């Protein structure tokens, strides 16, 4: 048994411009080397570009992209008798959201082209249209979980 206490879930403050905790989560995921103002600039520039294209609330498009890129199942490793099994488990909503954000930002950074805000905009638009690399990553995780469905009876 662990002697440490379970970490309390931190409350994320709302974004000052969009009044949304989702926007704050995206900014915190973009964040590199503690440069939060740069991360905020990238996010707001991305949202402005999406607003210009679709002429509607960019947070709705972001929510749709996150919904399309968040996995419902994933595999976790479990060691039983010297053998490590990939056990499929359901993903909770918060973890699904953070995984989707991770996939979208990771795949946006891998894209070719100039300017992270442009690459992030394109990845968000692709994910909202159910295409793009982030959605492919989600489908890949689902395939892995489906392949290991035989081990789903092992409790985690």
UniProtKB/Swiss-Prot annotation:
Where does this polypeptide localize? Plastid, Chloroplast
Can you list the GO cellular component terms from the UniProt entry?
chloroplast; small ribosomal subunit
Q: Which GO terms describe its biological process?
A: translation
Report the InterPro entries cross-referenced here.
Ribosomal_uS7, Ribosomal_uS7_bac/org-type, Ribosomal_uS7_CS, Ribosomal_uS7_dom, Ribosomal_uS7_dom_sf
Among its keywords, does the record have Cytoplasm? no
**CDD domains reported for this sequence:** uS7_Bacteria
Q: Of which family is this protein a member?
A: Belongs to the universal ribosomal protein uS7 family.
Q: Which PANTHER family match?
A: RIBOSOMAL PROTEIN S7
Under the subunit heading, UniProt states: Part of the 30S ribosomal subunit.
What's its job?
Answer: One of the primary rRNA binding proteins, it binds directly to 16S rRNA where it nucleates assembly of the head domain of the 30S subunit.
| Protein name per Swiss-Prot or TrEMBL | Small ribosomal subunit protein uS7c
């Amino acid at each position: 048994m662990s002697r440490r206490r379970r970490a309390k879930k931190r409350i994320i403050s709302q974004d000052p411009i969009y009044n949304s905790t989702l926007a704050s989560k995206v900014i915190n995921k973009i964040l590199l080397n503690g440069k939060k103002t740069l991360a905020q600039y990238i996010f707001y520039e991305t949202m402005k570009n999406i607003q210009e294209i679709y002429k509607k609330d960019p947070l709705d498009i972001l929510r749709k992209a996150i919904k399309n890129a968040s996995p419902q199942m994933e595999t976790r490793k479990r060691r039983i008798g010297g053998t490590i099994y990939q056990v499929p488990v359901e993903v909770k909503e918060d973890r699904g959201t953070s995984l989707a954000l991770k996939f979208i930002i990771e795949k946006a950074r891998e894209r070719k082209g100039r300017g992270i805000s442009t690459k992030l905009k394109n990845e968000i638009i692709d994910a909202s249209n159910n295409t793009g690399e982030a959605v492919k990553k989600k489908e890949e995780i689902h395939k892995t979980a489906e392949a290991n469905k035989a081990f789903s009876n092992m409790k985690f």
